[in-house]
Every structure is written in structure tokens, then in C-alpha cells.
Amino acid sequence: MPIIYSLVARGSSVLAEFTSTNGNFVTITRRILDLIPPNDTKMSYVYEKYIFHYLVSDTLTYLCMADEEFGRRIPFTFLDDVKNRFKSMYGDKGKTAIAYGMNSDFSRTLENLMDHYSNTTRVDTMSRTMAEIDEVKNILVSDIAPQLLKRGEKIEMLVERTDTLNQQSFKFKKQSKQLKCAMWWKNVKLMLVLGAIVLIIIFIIVMSYCDGFRSGSKCRSSPSSNSTPTPTPTETPTPTPTPTSTPTPSQLLETLLNQF
């Protein structure tokens, strides 16, 4: 939101205020209220990348804090509208009201006006620049940083919306990294499966020409159509000798007796 914070005050007493964020700029605004003179005037205080715009009218101060690049035309138009709404609702009661006496009702008005003027940026850049020159050429601009830095003050914006966006960004990066890893593993698994299929096909082709693992995977050559078959030699049977019987001693004795 370009308009970050707004308030209505009488001197250093804040009558109503609104902001949609958290931060120490509320404390810094109290320092700035002490520096604002009571006479009617318009002025902008530049501090770091923010500008505190204020106008004083009839002892009441109308102040807002906006981004530096938001310019000054819209913030001062916003402050004029806040002033008119406040006077139409409370008249002169603001001159005697206690601190935060109008906050319960007027803070909602500040919220609506801040939302409206923060989104009123659909203007041609050149016409906006020229209108800003015409409308704020008499508005003084001062750098308030040196006076506040003496006290060691620095604006620390703790915008809840920014924190939410940061968390969403971190979650998105984490999910992207996880998705990238998952896709990488998926590709690796696909390559492994394809490699296994190729190896199986090669193995089947090789095994179709080989004896397998029975003889050390020795491949057999395919038969040639022009080769002459080698004749197988036939073995000639060897005659089995007839065994001769050896005579016994009684037979030998009988033979000798017959000779005599």
C-alpha cells in the first residue's frame, strides 16, 4: 500500500490514526509531530525511502506516510479529503478532544480513504507529473533523517503482507526444487530401464548363436553349404583268438604210459 500510515493530531496528541502494517514508524511519527509548527502550512519530510506529508489547518495536523516513489500530489489530495471529512464529522470538537477520542470511528474513515487513494494510480505519467508540479510547487520538502538519526532511529517496516509473500516465494522455490529433483530421478530411472532392455536384447541375440554357458559360452559356427562332409572311418573287426586248453598233470601221465 503506497500510503502506509495516516493520523489526525492536535499538537502531539493523536486523535485518530490507522495503519495496516506493523513497524516502528509510529514512534518516528511522534518525533515528527514535535517538529511541526502550529501555523497553517503544508510540508513533506523525506526519511530514507519514505516521505511524511502533513498539512496543518486550524491547529489540527493531518499527516500520512507514503512510499517515496508515490509522489506528493496524491498524498496531499488524500490529506485534504481527510481534513474535510474530519471537519464535517466533528466540527470544532477536535480542538478540545482527548487523545484518541475520535479513533474508534474515524480510523475506519482513514482506512477507506487510504485504500482509495493508494489505488488511484491509473493516470497518465506525463499529466500526473505536470499536475504535481502545479499543485505542490509551493510545498516545502525537508530531509528529516539527520534529526532523527541523532537518536538512532531507523524505520523498520514489518509488513505482514510482505512476510506472507516471502513465505509463499520460499514455498514456491522449495516445491520447484523438489519437482526438479523428482524429474531428474525419473529421467535416470527411464535411462536405466532402456539400458536394461538393450542389454537383454543383445544377450538374446548372442545366445541364439552360442552354446550358452555349458562349454564356456563357446559359439558354434554356422554350417557352410559348400563344405564336403568328412567320411567317418570304419573300424575293421579283429578276430578273437580261440583259447587253447592247458593239459592237466594226469593227462600228461596217461599220454606217456600209452607211448610205452
Curated annotation (Swiss-Prot):
Task: Specify the Longin domain's residue ranges.
Answer: 7-110
- Signal peptide as annotated in the record: none
Where the record annotates domain v-SNARE coiled-coil homology, the positions are: 125-186
Would I find Endoplasmic reticulum among this entry's keywords?
A: yes
- Family per UniProt? Belongs to the synaptobrevin family.
Question: Which PROSITE patterns does this one have?
Answer: LONGIN (PS50859), V_SNARE (PS50892)
Q: Where in the cell is it found?
A: Cytoplasmic vesicle, Secretory vesicle membrane; Golgi apparatus, trans-Golgi network membrane; Late endosome membrane; Lysosome membrane
Q: Which residues lie on this side of the membrane: Cytoplasmic?
A: 1-189
Give the source species.
Answer: Dictyostelium discoideum
UniProt-recorded name of the protein: Vesicle-associated membrane protein 7B
Q: Where is this region: Disordered?
A: 215-250
Assigned keywords, A-Z: Coiled coil, Cytoplasmic vesicle, Endoplasmic reticulum, Endosome, Golgi apparatus, Lysosome, Membrane, Protein transport, Signal-anchor, Transmembrane, Transmembrane helix, Transport
A single GO CC term for this protein reads: SNARE complex
